[in-house]
């Protein structure tokens, strides 16, 4: 499929029949990350050029914006529905305090980023879940953003690419959270019934409630 021709694979021992990748050239002034698997310190620039995969084959987790930079053509992403935010309908103790703290630490307003972009020159709608925002859990705002994106894609006859990184339903929102699975599934079905393409990318971690 031409839509997927841009995809390339990282170089590592797991993808090359056990052969080791080239030795890491380290610069003392460059920030590094320690691989939890092989315990080596790897320069951030080396990880970035290799899709955040260590030479031993360990995959580092990525934020939504990092994945966006890998997936979308440069300067093609236009964010949608960022004004849809969490509200505390159940008055769950300390919920909004946690949300505000998470917004600061993750630099995102919610657990999903939605918009339009070009991937390999192909226009599409794109959503990426943010693991640093309450483990990418699906609350009412997340469900509403994704539903609106599929409705937008159906109206404009665009394919959708979705990156799921989620710990499941957001317990602080109770039934309002559980309702989102039915709502988003309905929007996905209408998009499919219109004969449009949807590519879900399941990444670590993705639990059954949001697949």
Placement of each model-derived feature along the sequence:
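Extended, hydrophobic alpha-helical segments in both membrane/secreted and soluble proteins
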Residues: 198, 210-211
């Amino acid at each position: 499929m031409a839509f997927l021709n841009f995809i390339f694979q990282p170089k590592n021992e797991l993808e090359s029949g056990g052969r080791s990748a080239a030795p890491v050239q380290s610069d003392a002034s460059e920030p590094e990350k320690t691989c939890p698997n092989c315990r080596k310190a790897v320069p951030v620039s080396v990880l970035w050029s290799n899709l955040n995969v260590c030479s031993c084959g360990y995959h580092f987790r990525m934020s939504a914006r990092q994945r966006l930079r890998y997936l979308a053509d440069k300067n093609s992403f236009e964010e949608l529905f960022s004004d849809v935010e969490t509200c505390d309908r159940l008055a769950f103790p300390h919920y909004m305090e946690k949300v505000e703290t998470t917004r600061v630490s993750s630099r995102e307003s919610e657990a999903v980023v939605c918009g339009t972009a070009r991937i390999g020159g192909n226009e599409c709608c794109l959503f990426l879940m943010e693991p640093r925002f309450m483990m990418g859990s699906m609350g009412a705002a997340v469900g509403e953003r994704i539903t609106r994106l599929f409705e937008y894609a159906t109206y404009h006859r665009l394919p959708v690419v979705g990156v799921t990184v989620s710990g499941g339903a957001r317990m602080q929102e109770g039934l309002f959270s559980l309702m989102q699975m039915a709502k988003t599934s309905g929007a996905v079905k209408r998009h499919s019934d219109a004969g449009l393409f949807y590519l879900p990318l399941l990444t670590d971690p993705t639990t059954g409630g949001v697949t």
